[in-house]
Amino acid sequence: MSNKSNRRSLRDIGNTIGRNNIPSDKDNVFVRLSMSPLRTTSQKEFLKPPMRISPNKTDGMKHSIQVTPRRIMSPECLKGYVSKETQSLDRPQFKNSNKNVKIQNSDHITNIIFPTSPTKLTFSNENKIGGDGSLTRIRARFKNGLMSPERIQQQQQQHILPSDAKSNTDLCSNTELKDAPFENDLPRAKLKGKNLLVELKKEEEDVGNGIESLTKSNTKLNSMLANEGKIHKASFQKSVKFKLPDNIVTEETVELKEIKDLLLQMLRRQREIESRLSNIELQLTEIPKHK
């Protein structure tokens, strides 16, 4: 009876649901655990991104292989070793020699100083085509972008043209500007030699003729139309006048008074001189009559 009880396989007590439907060979725990279940891959698993270990986790991981330090001490047998000459097939211009490599022996570490790379020597003298982002930014800031070929031609033509031709073009442009009623219809070349002082003088004359009052009335009407239907708050305004006392006399007022006195003296002297001149003229006219 004891042998039969030992042969009896261990049963999974936890898995009670649907135990009757499971075959007898799957009922054994060891058999069930030894067999791997079928992997069913769904579409959702394909869409997921690949799982990677974060760098924080990898830092703390211990390597099974011993990692060597960055600078390894050279052994005693290789301290006086000189490497043989090697010829590079890719770079025939590079000639390796023992003179280029300087070996400095110390007690602990062998320091090897290598010469400059031959590729750096060959490509250092070549001018680089194009430019980086900083240069383009500088050009755009100070030159208003790179000049087009048409613009360069225009500048060259302007330098080549003599001064007489320029004066003739300016005269023609001025006459055409007078005849043309609309300035916007004219090309830029004709508007180039225009004098703005004439326009400013015209504006000043127009203001004197009464255009200023007309513009004021128009602006007032427009503001009234715009403000229709709006609730306005009463604006309280105060006009304050400051009067200086009479005893305060500044330097400017003194200077003005002196200038006024000088002008009055000049006018008085002018009248005296005019009266004297008139008397002399009368005397000169009366002398020939007596004769």
Curated annotation (Swiss-Prot):
Miscellaneous note of the record: Strong overexpression results in the accumulation of filamentous structures resembling the neurofibrillary tangles found in cells of patients with Alzheimer disease.
Highest rank taxon of the organism: Eukaryota
PTM annotation (Phosphoserine): residues: 54, 74, 88
Coiled-coil regions listed: 254-284
InterPro entries (alphabetical): Fin1
GO molecular function, one term: structural constituent of cytoskeleton
Induction per the UniProt record: Induced during G2-M transition.
Domain comment as written in the entry: The coiled coil domain is essential for dimerization.
Biological-process GO terms, alphabetical: deactivation of mitotic spindle assembly checkpoint; intermediate filament cytoskeleton organization; mitotic sister chromatid segregation; mitotic spindle organization; protein localization to kinetochore
Locations listed in the record: Nucleus; Cytoplasm; Cytoplasm, Cytoskeleton; Cytoplasm, Cytoskeleton, Spindle pole
Post-translational modification: Phosphorylated by CDC28. Phosphorylation is required for BMH1 and BMH2 interaction. Dephosphorylation by GLC7 depends on the presence of BMH1 and BMH2.
Protein name: Filament protein FIN1
Keyword Cytoplasm among UniProt keywords: yes
UniProt function note: Forms cell-cycle specific filaments between the spindle pole bodies of dividing yeast cells.
Cystine residue pairs: none
Gene Ontology CC, one term: spindle pole body
Chief location bin: nucleus
A Pfam family matched in the record: FIN1
Positions bearing Phosphothreonine: 68
UniProt keyword list: Coiled coil, Cytoplasm, Cytoskeleton, Nucleus, Phosphoprotein
Assembly information from the UniProt record: Homooligomer; in vitro, FIN1 self-assembles into 10 nm diameter filaments. Interacts with the 14-3-3 proteins BMH1 and BMH2, and the protein phosphatase 1 complex catalytic subunit GLC7.
